[in-house]
Amino acid sequence: MSEGSSNSTHFGYKTVDAEKKADLVADVFHSVAAKYDIMNDVMSFGIHRLWKRFTIESAGARPGMKVLDLAGGTGDLTAKFSHIVGNTGQVTLADINDSMLKVGREKLRNRGVVGNVNYVQANAEALPFPDNHFDIITIAFGLRNVTDKDAAIRSMLRVLKPGGKLLILEFSKPQHDLMRKVYDLYSFKILPKMGDIITQDAGSYEYLAESIRMHPDQETLKGMMVDAGFEQVEYTNMTDGIVALHKGYKF
């Protein structure tokens, strides 16, 4: 187990049994699924769209490719990839949470994103796909919620084709003291209040802030990817490192 002892891990700042974390995280996303997109726009001031756009551009997807949008939630990346890979390609939107998957499916179908998208409820630690199957895997704002991150990264490596690329978009560590102080104030004082007003669920957004602080920093995550077997691993900080995009290849 990559976090804590063999039978414990963290849920935000709390130490919990590893077997219980998935259920606790599931409760959070069952609670916020219906207003997930609204909260993303509000809490990031819309900047999450720029972070995701950069991820799409960095992926280098082309017509005919197979893409896995892991922890794909409400399908922002899936919608873009669906257009890029076209009728000869395939995008799989996978999420462990059925509430998020349902919201994503309804949203994309209402927008006419059909034909080359399929939906799979899946645990990132044990992906239910064949070896060497996908050209590209993205996981955006999902890895920090995974109990055994090392197992998940190894699972992603297994299902990537040789030459395939993994992109991990995740909250990370601000690079400057002033930004860290402002970010902490926003995350722990303002964000839960916004969550309470919009979703009537301050607790889920307290967990969000805590889970971000407990997530590995940029260099640690890079090392985890290298240890799993990824090559040419690098990362790009965005918004002073509040978010980082890690990229690695399977050869």
UniProtKB/Swiss-Prot annotation:
Name of the protein in its database record: Ubiquinone/menaquinone biosynthesis C-methyltransferase UbiE
Tagged with keyword S-adenosyl-L-methionine: yes
Similarity section: Belongs to the class I-like SAM-binding methyltransferase superfamily. MenG/UbiE family.
Record has Methyltransferase as a keyword: yes
Superkingdom: Bacteria
BP terms from Gene Ontology: aerobic respiration; menaquinone biosynthetic process; methylation
Reactions catalysed: a 2-demethylmenaquinol + S-adenosyl-L-methionine = a menaquinol + S-adenosyl-L-homocysteine + H(+); a 2-methoxy-6-(all-trans-polyprenyl)benzene-1,4-diol + S-adenosyl-L-methionine = a 5-methoxy-2-methyl-3-(all-trans-polyprenyl)benzene-1,4-diol + S-adenosyl-L-homocysteine + H(+)
Organism of provenance: Shewanella loihica (strain ATCC BAA-1088 / PV-4)
Classification via HAMAP family: MenG_UbiE_methyltr
EC number: 2.1.1.163, 2.1.1.201
UniProt binding sites for S-adenosyl-L-methionine: T74, D95, N123, A124
NCBIfam families cross-referenced by the UniProt entry: MenG_MenH_UbiE, PRK00216.1-1, PRK00216.1-3, PRK00216.1-5
PROSITE patterns per the UniProt record, alphabetical: SAM_MT_UBIE, UBIE_1, UBIE_2
Xref: InterPro entries: SAM-dependent_MTases_sf, UbiE/COQ5_MeTrFase, UbiE/COQ5_MeTrFase_CS
Function (record text): Methyltransferase required for the conversion of demethylmenaquinol (DMKH2) to menaquinol (MKH2) and the conversion of 2-polyprenyl-6-methoxy-1,4-benzoquinol (DDMQH2) to 2-polyprenyl-3-methyl-6-methoxy-1,4-benzoquinol (DMQH2).
Pathway: Quinol/quinone metabolism; menaquinone biosynthesis; menaquinol from 1,4-dihydroxy-2-naphthoate: step 2/2; Cofactor biosynthesis; ubiquinone biosynthesis
Keywords: Menaquinone biosynthesis, Methyltransferase, S-adenosyl-L-methionine, Transferase, Ubiquinone biosynthesis
Root EC class: transferase
Any one GO MF annotation of this record: demethylmenaquinone methyltransferase activity
